[in-house]
């Protein structure tokens, strides 16, 4: 059974039934907490479940985005998100997603991974990096991070992503 409600705007939204489903022992849920404290505020309702040992929370770092391009920005943004959501820092795992969009080059991806490592590694381990599936063969031998090839599903007409 898959529970989905389409959302057409980037707004803090919570669908019904999440708490009930999260209490099921075999529940697997993917929740997007947004890029700032406004979007993360909705996660506060789930804080007890999200802080449980079986939960895994990722903070996605894209060094090409304004809120995660410098350690100070990451610290401020993550601090605000954790403050309003009541999620414990110990629960947060870091993943790198260095991209400039659908046309990110292999070199941009590798440079972005190095930037994330330089900023984050002294403080927390980086679990893995997401790389567009088409770039994976070009970067898999040159990146120090574990890689998760991904496919883009969300696209916009003006990008003409193939």
Functional labels for PLM-detected ranges:
Residues 1-7, 26-42:
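Switch II (G3) loop of P-loop NTPases
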Residues 3, 61, 98, 151-153:
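Residues at the C-termini of beta-strands that transition into short coil/loop
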Residues 5-18:
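Short phosphate-binding loop-to-helix
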Residues 5-8, 101-103, 134-137, 153-159:
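A short acidic, often aromatic-flanked loop/helix-cap motif at beta-alpha or helix-coil junctions
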Residues 18-21, 49, 119, 153:
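Residues that form generic nucleotide/phosphate-binding pockets
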Residues 22-29, 52-53:
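Glycine-rich phosphate-binding loop signature in dinucleotide/nucleotide-binding domains
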Residues 37-143:
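Conserved catalytic-core segment of NTP-binding enzymes
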Residues 124, 141-156, 162:
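Active-site regions of enzymes building and remodeling cell-envelope glycoconjugates
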């Amino acid at each position: 059974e898959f529970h989905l409600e389409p959302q057409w705007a980037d707004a803090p939204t919570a669908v019904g039934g999440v708490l009930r489903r999260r209490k099921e022992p075999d529940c697997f849920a993917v929740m997007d907490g947004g890029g700032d404290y406004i979007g993360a505020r909705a996660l506060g309702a789930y804080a007890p479940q999200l802080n449980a040992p079986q939960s895994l929370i990722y903070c996605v770092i894209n060094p090409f985005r304004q809120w995660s391009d410098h350690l100070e920005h990451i610290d401020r943004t993550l601090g605000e998100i954790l403050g309003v959501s009541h999620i414990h820092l110990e629960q947060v795992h870091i993943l790198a997603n260095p991209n400039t969009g659908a046309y990110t080059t292999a070199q941009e991806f590798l440079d972005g991974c190095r930037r994330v490592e330089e900023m984050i590694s002294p403080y927390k381990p980086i679990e893995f990096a997401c790389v567009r599936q088409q770039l994976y063969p070009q970067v898999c031998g040159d990146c120090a991070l574990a890689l998760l090839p991904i496919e883009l599903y969300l696209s916009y007409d003006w990008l003409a992503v193939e």
